UniProtKB/Swiss-Prot annotation:
Organism of provenance: Phaeodactylum tricornutum (strain CCAP 1055/1)
Family the entry assigns: Belongs to the bacterial ribosomal protein bL36 family.
Designated gene of the protein: rpl36
Name of the featured protein: Large ribosomal subunit protein bL36c
The keyword Ribosomal protein appears for this protein: yes
Gene Ontology molecular function terms on file: structural constituent of ribosome
InterPro entries xref list: Ribosomal_bL36, Ribosomal_bL36_sp
GO cellular component, one term: chloroplast
Xref: Pfam families: Ribosomal_L36
Sorted UniProt keywords: Chloroplast, Plastid, Ribonucleoprotein, Ribosomal protein
Subcellular location: Plastid, Chloroplast
PANTHER family to which the protein is assigned, alphabetical: 50S RIBOSOMAL PROTEIN L36, CHLOROPLASTIC, LARGE RIBOSOMAL SUBUNIT PROTEIN BL36C
Gene Ontology BP annotations: translation
Amino acid sequence: MKVRPSVKKMCDKCRVIKRHGKIMVICSNPKHKQRQG
């Protein structure tokens, strides 16, 4: 899980979702998981 000021899709399988008011990226590749800090 990467915590970043700006989250971006890193590949075609990445999906940007909003969970508990936080913007997150979920993907089949675990390296692409991101959360906005």
